[in-house]
Amino acid sequence: MKAIPTFTISVRQIESLSQIEEKLNNLSLTAKNNIDNASTHEELDKLRVSLLGKKGDLSIILKIMGQLSAAERPIVGQKANFIKINLQDLLNKRKNQLNNEALDQQIKNEKIDVTIPSIGTPPGSKHPLISTQDEIIDIFCGLGYTVESGPEIESDFYNFESLNIPKNHPARDMQDTFYLDENRLLRTHTSPVQIRYLEKNPPPVRIIAPGRVYRRDAVDATHSPVFNQVEVLCIDQDINFSHLRGTVLTFLKTFFGDIPVRFRASYFPFTEPSAEVDVQWKGKWLEVMGCGMVDPKVLEKLGIDSEKWTGFAAGLGVERFCMVRHQIDDIRKFYTNDLRFLEQF
């Protein structure tokens, strides 16, 4: 590193006000020249100390001001402070210049070939439940159904009463349903979407209603208080159980492939007759769907002539279909966000 010229002041050099002013002027000129010629941050730091430090030239002048008269001290003090502020500004500007010069040199030395392919960010993938639900929707859309949705916070009327679920039905029990107040609740199925749709759209109707539903189930390997459901509704003239059976079998064969399927008689308040659908899984029968012919009372409450129009409804849980498809034995794995599990799909 090159030597930096210095300008020092001693007490013996001070004889009069004019001498001090001359020394300050010379100091300012010499310091400016040294700052402009400083080529490194280290040189700048040494200049800062020699000029503005406790033992620097300006500090020496300020210390000997006591030897001057009361009238002279303000003159010297004002000039010294002006020079101090000016030198601080020069030092900071030169520091910024050195930083910019270093950055320019770095940019010149570190050229980037923009034609080189980047490493890229690993792409994400759909959650297995989303993929399963999308596949279910695609199958029914291929059968001529359209997708409808509705609110997750429902009224007692749409969730229960309009679906022929009586006041004393166990599903209305607070142990099974999340009530927000006396008349509002978190929907326990997506069937209310069907009612809302039929209120505004006369038959014929072919819709599916996917979405989240809520039930007060204890969390275990096969139950969750929040899960995904897809409801199916078909209303048309001369619809009978064979249409229901054919639709369900077509859907299950398309989704699972050649797998044993059976229908069992069951009961649901909003369908009559009703059935549950089982498939073979790990050597046992596993329920995967509930279905049935729409109860005429449900249609009549909506002002639909049940003598002219008939239909069927079916419902399924997306989680269960995904578990059967991928041989997953615990529903909780879907909600832990464990990448070791999710990256398998």
UniProtKB/Swiss-Prot annotation:
Question: For binding Mg(2+), which residues are annotated in this chain's numbering?
Answer: E272
What cofactor does this protein call for? Answer: Mg(2+)
- Copy out the cofactor comment: Binds 2 magnesium ions per tetramer.
- Molecular function terms from GO: ATP binding; magnesium ion binding; phenylalanine-tRNA ligase activity; tRNA binding
PROSITE patterns named in the record:
AA_TRNA_LIGASE_II
Q: Which GO terms describe its biological process?
A: phenylalanyl-tRNA aminoacylation
Residue intervals passing through the bilayer:
none
Q: Which Gene3D superfamilies match?
A: Bira Bifunctional Protein, Domain 2 (3.30.930.10)
Q: Where in the cell is it found?
A: Cytoplasm
Which Gene Ontology terms of cellular component type are present?
cytoplasm
Per its UniProt record, what HAMAP family does this chain match? Answer: Phe_tRNA_synth_alpha1 (MF_00281)
Name of the molecule in the record: Phenylalanine--tRNA ligase alpha subunit
What species is given as this protein's source? Answer: Prochlorococcus marinus (strain MIT 9312)
